Amino acid sequence: MYAVLATGGKQYRVQEGDVIYVEKLDAEVDSTVELTEVLAVANDEGIKVGAPVVEGAKVTAKVLAQGKQKKVIVFKYKAKKDYRRKNGHRQPYTKLVIEKIEA
C-alpha cells in the first residue's frame, strides 16, 4: 500500500516505514503529525485518486528530526563592472518516518 501526499509545495510517494525529508513543519521532535492532503492511495484492490484530495484519507508520521540542509552558495556578478555578491542559504527541513496510511 502506498500514498501520494502533498506538503510544502511538493509531492511524495510514501509507504509505511519510509523516511522522508519535507519542508519545515511546526512540530516537536518525537511528536506525531497527520498529513491530510493525500492526493492518491493505492492498495491491493486498486488505486483511488482524489479530486483534488482523497476524502477521509490521512497519513500519520513521526517527527525524527528538525534541521537545516547543506549550504547553497548564490554568487551574482556582472562581467567587467566590479559587481560581485555572495550569499549563502540553508533551507530548514523536517525528517519524518511514515507510520500509518489510512484510506
From Swiss-Prot:
rRNA-binding as UniProt keyword: yes
Keywords noted in UniProt: Ribonucleoprotein, Ribosomal protein, RNA-binding, rRNA-binding
Cellular component aspect of the GO annotation: cytoplasm; ribonucleoprotein complex; ribosome
GO molecular-function terms, A-Z: rRNA binding; structural constituent of ribosome
GO BP annotation list: translation
Quaternary organization: Part of the 50S ribosomal subunit. Contacts protein L20.
Function: This protein binds to 23S rRNA in the presence of protein L20.
Family listed: Belongs to the bacterial ribosomal protein bL21 family.
UniProt protein name: Large ribosomal subunit protein bL21
Organism this protein belongs to: Clostridium botulinum (strain Eklund 17B / Type B)
